């Protein structure tokens, strides 16, 4: 019996991106078809463990010090001394995954500063549909137990299914991090572990905003309200948000490090994340009072002011209504008046849910669009409007607003189209251990002028932004994972430009667009095309005699110029141009030139071929000097983009990223020889494609031999 030959498949960075895009178009990454995180298949792993009679141990997030953290919880930290990893079955005789359903009291904070995450989990328990999108049914420490559990998390536009083992950090016989009040329930501790896994460690979860957890559990988009500047109808906004299943969180800002986790006179914790779990208006002494219900993940520290559990205000409320609203003492949940809420708290976060999270609800839903993008040094990281020379190279997205809001939505206000823009930077929490923190990000919105409305999706250039002011922008540039702002603008076309504050700050991002009415969106990018010069048909008689004499002197006895001879000639000439910064032409770049011009295929250049190349290089030199704006002898990566267009090539942003990576120096400068090599390579590839595209449909098909032939000698 012959064995099947195994053929390895290797994906380069570019091909991997293409493969990922194709998979997404087929539905991979939606909640119903979540990506298996790190390739781990929960069912396969569980069955394998059951068949072998072993308990699962996750080597992708092993029970070792590095999984706890890298600094404060690092391997040599005193805070991690004595921590062991144990399974719930080693701690209790009858551990449970969930007892009587998941409730807000299942989440009690441990030694980790992730109250923001726990507040989000607490809000999640209010909605069974949302909860079980994150915590799949059918998991247990009894039936089919194999020491393996899984959870589904939203990560930057994709749902991922995350597998964990049930080895949890233990100290002095107790869970170190999140735990339930019951003591024998472990779903919240295991969910925290899954979240730590996707972020690299438990320590990576320290510090954050509730909105981050909201979004990673729902795929929704979050709005922020500074309560000192809140709209007059905020209570109605909260009521409507709770009715729509939105998740809400709030906090009290700190004025110094000493304030962190400080407890106020009325038992509110500063710098601490609370979840908003309800809102209700009650009749109190003949007046309607607006109340709001809060939850503190710590559990035991509660508000002691008006409308707290033991306050006298409840004695003047109808007994039936009072019994419906009052909660148990010391569970971390409490009521307070909306007036006190506005006075005591600093900010409110509301996570609006995507339509797929609200399938069973007969309510109005957002229209949503998501784009992924990158900022790359020298090509697409142009910085904010403060840097006009480079701002235009940032990614651009066009929005077309057609329908205004329903009249009921804006009352007497001027009509317009409401939408939320949210810009999120990717993977920054996971990269903390490498010293990389959040970049300062934001975005600007520009109205498309009438003469450009309806035009193809062409990337807007520098002159447009120099001549036009922004129509709207994010409230601020800030170093948070996400910046979001609600807008209401008249119908029309607009261009959104997301950016870092400073140029050349690299990162990946997700831009999301939530609109109340249907709207059109498209990423602006130039269409790939080349205005190539006609291939010259010259005879030797048409060439200048002086050039012929020069050629005879350079070519030698065979009257042809080889690759090595071409390098010697070009480097001798370029060395005389003292204004050019160059290391000289390499053999590889000269070989590319010969391949482009060699018509008879002998690997050398004859008189006519060398004449055409010579004129081409003179033209390239003219373009190079034109776009070397500071006369430094080299071009910046951004100047090169304009120079390439001047040479007749229109490329999209992904190709510019590749070109800058390949042809620029570490300081993002492009010298003359690299510029020439780039243009020669571009022309060669365009001409190859044009030759093969016989039916002019922009698509060519070839076998492996032809592919290798083209790529080896281009």
UniProtKB/Swiss-Prot annotation:
Binds 4 Ca(2+) ions. GO terms for biological process: mammary gland involution; NMDA selective glutamate receptor signaling pathway; positive regulation of cell population proliferation; proteolysis; receptor catabolic process; regulation of catalytic activity; regulation of macroautophagy; self proteolysis. The modification N-acetylserine is found at residue 2. Its main location: cytoplasm. The keyword Acetylation applies. Keywords: Acetylation, Autocatalytic cleavage, Calcium, Cell membrane, Cytoplasm, Disease variant, Hereditary spastic paraplegia, Hydrolase, Membrane, Metal-binding, Neurodegeneration, Phosphoprotein, Protease, Repeat, Thiol protease. It is found in: Cytoplasm; Cell membrane. Its EC number is 3.4.22.52. The keyword Hydrolase applies. Residues 541-576, 585-618, 615-650, 680-714 form the EF-hand domain. It holds the Pfam family Calpain_III. Calcium-regulated non-lysosomal thiol-protease which catalyzes limited proteolysis of substrates involved in cytoskeletal remodeling and signal transduction. Proteolytically cleaves CTBP1 at 'Asn-375', 'Gly-387' and 'His-409'. Cleaves and activates caspase-7 (CASP7). This is Calpain-1 catalytic subunit. It comes from Homo sapiens. The lineage of its organism: Eukaryota, Metazoa, Chordata, Craniata, Vertebrata. The gene is CAPN1.
């Amino acid at each position: 019996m012959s064995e099947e030959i195994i053929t390895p498949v290797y994906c380069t960075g570019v091909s991997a991106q293409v493969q990922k895009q194709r998979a997404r178009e087929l539905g991979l990454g939606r909640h119903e078809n979540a990506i298996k995180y790190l390739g781990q298949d929960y069912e396969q792993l569980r069955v394998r463990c059951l068949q072998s009679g072993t308990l699962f141990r996750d080597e992708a997030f092993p029970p070792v010090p590095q999984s706890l953290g890298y600094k404060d919880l690092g391997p040599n930290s005193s805070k991690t001394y004595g921590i062991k990893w144990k399974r719930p079955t080693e701690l209790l005789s009858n551990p449970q995954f969930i007892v009587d359903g998941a409730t807000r009291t299942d989440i009690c904070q441990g030694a980790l500063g992730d109250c923001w995450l726990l507040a989000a989990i607490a809000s999640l328990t209010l909605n069974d549909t949302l909860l079980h999108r994150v915590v799949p049914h059918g998991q247990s420490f009894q039936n089919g137990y194999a020491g393996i559990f899984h959870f589904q998390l939203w990560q930057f536009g994709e749902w991922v299914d995350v597998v964990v083992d049930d080895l949890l950090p233990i100290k002095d016989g107790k869970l170190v991090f999140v735990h339930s009040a019951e003591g024998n329930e472990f779903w919240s501790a295991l969910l925290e572990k899954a979240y730590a896994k996707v972020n690299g460690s438990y320590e990576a979860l320290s510090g954050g905003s509730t909105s981050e957890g909201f979004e990673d559990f729902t795929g929704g988009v979050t709005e922020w309200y500074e309560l000192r500047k809140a709209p007059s109808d905020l209570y109605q906004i909260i009521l409507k948000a709770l009715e729509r299943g939105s998740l809400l969180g709030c906090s009290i800002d700190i004025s110094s490090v000493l304030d962190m986790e400080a407890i106020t006179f009325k038992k509110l914790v500063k710098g601490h994340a609370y979840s908003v779990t309800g809102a209700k208006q009650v009749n109190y002494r003949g007046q309607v009072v607006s109340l709001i219900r809060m939850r503190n993940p710590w559990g035991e520290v509660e508000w002691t002011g008006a409308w707290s559990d033991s306050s006298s205000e409840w004695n003047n409320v109808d007994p039936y209504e009072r019994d419906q609203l009052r909660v148990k003492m010391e569970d971390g949940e409490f009521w307070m008046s909306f007036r006190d809420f506005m006075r005591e708290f600093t900010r409110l976060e509301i996570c609006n849910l995507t339509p797929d999270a609200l399938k069973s609800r007969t309510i109005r839903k957002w229209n949503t669009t998501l784009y992924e993008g990158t900022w790359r040094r020298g090509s697409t990281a142009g910085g904010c409007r403060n840097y006009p020379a480079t701002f235009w190279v940032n990614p651009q997205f066009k929005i077309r607003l057609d329908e205004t809001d329903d009249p009921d939505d804006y009352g007497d206000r001027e009509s317009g189209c409401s939408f939320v823009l949210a810009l999120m930077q990717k993977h920054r929490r996971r990269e903390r251990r490498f010293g990389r923190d959040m970049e300062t990000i934001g975005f600007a919105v520009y109205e498309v002028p009438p003469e450009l409305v309806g035009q193809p999706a062409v990337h807007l250039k520098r002159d447009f932004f120099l001549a036009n002011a922004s129509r709207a922008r994010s409230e601020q540039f800030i170093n948070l994972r996400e910046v979001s702002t609600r807008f209401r603008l008249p119908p029309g076309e607009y261009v959104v430009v997301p950016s870092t504050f400073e140029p050349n700050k690299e990162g990946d991002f997700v831009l999301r667009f939530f609109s109340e009415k249907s709207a059109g969106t498209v990423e602006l990018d130039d269409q790939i095309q080349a205005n190539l010069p006609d291939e010259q048909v010259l005879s030797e008689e048409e060439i200048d005699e002086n050039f012929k004499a020069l050629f005879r002197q350079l070519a030698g006895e065979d009257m042809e110029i080889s690759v090595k001879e071409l390098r010697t000639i070009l480097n001798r000439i370029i060395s005389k141009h003292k204004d050019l910064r160059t290391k000289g032409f390499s053999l590889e770049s000269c070989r590319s030139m010969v391949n482009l011009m060699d018509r008879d295929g002998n690997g050398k250049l004859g008189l006519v071929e060398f004449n055409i190349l010579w004129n081409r290089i003179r033209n390239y030199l003219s373009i190079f000097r034109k776009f070397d704006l500071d006369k430094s002898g080299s071009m910046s990566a951004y100047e090169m983009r304009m120079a390439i267009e001047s040479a007749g090539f229109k490329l999209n942003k992904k190709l510019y990223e590749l070109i800058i990576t390949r042809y620029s120096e570490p300081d993002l400068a492009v010298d003359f020889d690299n510029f020439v090599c780039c243009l020669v390579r571009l022309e060669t590839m365009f001409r190859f494609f044009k030759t093969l595209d016989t039916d002019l449909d922009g698509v060519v098909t070839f076998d492996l031999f032809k592919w290798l032939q083209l790529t080896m000698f281009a």
